[in-house]
Amino acid sequence: TNVQDGAVLHVSHQGKFSDRGHPLSIGEDVTIGHRAVIHGCTVGNYCLIGIGAIIMDNAVLEDYVMLGAGALVPPNKRLESGYLYVGSPAKQSRPLSENEKEFLRYSASHYASLKNVYLKEGSES
């Protein structure tokens, strides 16, 4: 899993308007784009959260979900596995192709592998 620049990951607290608050759970091999806000929700495995997307409290993204840039997932919404979602509020746009699912598996591991390159470059200077 990789979290890009400016992303905010947050839980919600227990209080007057939320009996228990909502934890944040992020699965394996997830790419969280720049400036995305992930708030008290569950993100499954092999998801891509687009740049500037917002996911609100108690929302659930099943495995293999691609969320478009700037999309808004409202509280308590469940996004079904294997689809692209876009818009505000996020709506199911179309099924993901096998090539796109393969890209989701590749994306997070690629970004994570870049850290090794940067660490090596930094140690040589």
Positions of predicted regions on the chain:
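Short proline/glycine- and basic residue-enriched helix-capping loop/turn segments at helix->loop/beta transitions
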Residues: 31
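Glycine-rich hexapeptide-repeat left-handed beta-helix
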Residues: 5-24, 34-125
